[in-house]
UniProtKB/Swiss-Prot annotation:
GO terms for molecular function: uroporphyrin-III C-methyltransferase activity. Belongs to the precorrin methyltransferase family. One of its GO terms (biological process) is methylation. It comes from Pseudomonas fluorescens. It catalyses: uroporphyrinogen III + 2 S-adenosyl-L-methionine = precorrin-2 + 2 S-adenosyl-L-homocysteine + H(+). This is Uroporphyrinogen-III C-methyltransferase. S-adenosyl-L-homocysteine binds at residues 12, 117-118, 168, 197, 225. Signal peptide: none annotated. Pathway: Cofactor biosynthesis; adenosylcobalamin biosynthesis; precorrin-2 from uroporphyrinogen III: step 1/1; Porphyrin-containing compound metabolism; siroheme biosynthesis; precorrin-2 from uroporphyrinogen III: step 1/1. The keyword Methyltransferase applies. It is a step in the biosynthesis of both cobalamin (vitamin B12) and siroheme. InterPro entries: 4pyrrol_Mease (IPR000878), 4pyrrol_Methylase_sf (IPR035996), 4pyrrole_Mease_sub1 (IPR014777), 4pyrrole_Mease_sub2 (IPR014776), CobA/CysG_C (IPR006366), Siro_Cobalamin_biosynth (IPR050161), Uropor_MeTrfase_CS (IPR003043). Its EC number is 2.1.1.107. Pfam families: TP_methylase.
């Protein structure tokens, strides 16, 4: 019988944010493929499984995706059940959708298991509500790192009026700043830059759109980091949020 595959989100880093469904999948797995950004402590839930590291880290040397695909197919004949364990959640900038499609086209049974995304975990740890009545009625999740290195339409995002949560944006802070300002986003819009979201070494740099690039340099912001851009990013700072009846 063919192996069952779980594509599992390991959460943003804090092992206590692992879901119960993810824990059950790890308990059942014979083999676990683990991403570079996954906290090794989650492997306590699969002590007898064979663990294979398949590093995927933006801006660094990574395991090629086609190699991961071939490895997945090879595991089909060698394991009864296995997990591909990814940081955060596999279906938000985690290749979970394309991996599930690739496996299903080859007759492999696949189950996707969501995790808590880093944008939500990091914001929550900094007491930032991504939506807030009278302030922000929506959230837009975007990645600044694309496969073809094309740029997002930041000007359109500036006009959207939602909280922006930007993944993989550290290397493009100046481009993001310029494009949002050109899209008429206010220069004093609050920005929170959150490094190592949910981990004990989490760091937080509060700034504004106009100054976020220079402040990040002084702060020595490093990846992995999340950017939260919008009025809600002023949460926790006295008199920093203005509530509007129309929001």
């Amino acid at each position: 019988m063919s192996a069952k595959v779980w594509l599992v989100g390991a959460g943003p880093g804090d092992p206590e944010l692992l879901t119960l469904k993810a824990v059950r999948a790890l308990h059942a797995a014979d083999v676990v493929l683990i991403d570079d950004l996954v906290n090794p402590r989650v492997l306590e839930h699969c002590p007898d499984a064979r663990v294979i590291t398949v590093g995927k880290r933006g801006g660094c040397r990574s395991t090629p995706q086609d190699f991961i695909h071939r490895l997945m197919l090879a595991m089909r004949a060698k394991a009864n059940a296995w997990c591909d364990l990814r940081a955060a959640t596999p279906c938000i900038f985690g290749r979970g959708g394309e991996e599930a499609l690739w496996l299903r086209e080859r007759g492999v049974e696949v189950e996707l298991v969501n995790g808590i995304t880093a944008g939500l975990a990091g914001a929550t740890n900094c007491d930032i509500p991504l939506t807030l009545r009278g302030v922000s009625r929506g959230v837009t999740l975007v990645t600044a790192h694309t496969q073809d290195d094309s740029s997002l339409n930041w000007r359109a995002l500036a006009e959207g009026g939602t909280t922006l949560v930007v993944y993989m944006g550290v290397a493009k802070l100046e481009e993001i700043r310029q494009q949002l300002l050109e899209g008429a986003m206010a220069a004093d819009t609050p920005v929170a830059m959150i490094e190592n979201a949910s981990l004990p070494q989490q760091r937080e740099c509060r700034s504004t759109l106009a100054h976020m690039h220079t402040d990040a340099q002084v702060f020595a912001l490093k990846s992995p980091a999340i950017l939260v851009i919008g009025s809600v990013a002023g949460a926790g700072q006295a008199a920093s949020i203005t509530v509007s009846a129309s929001a």
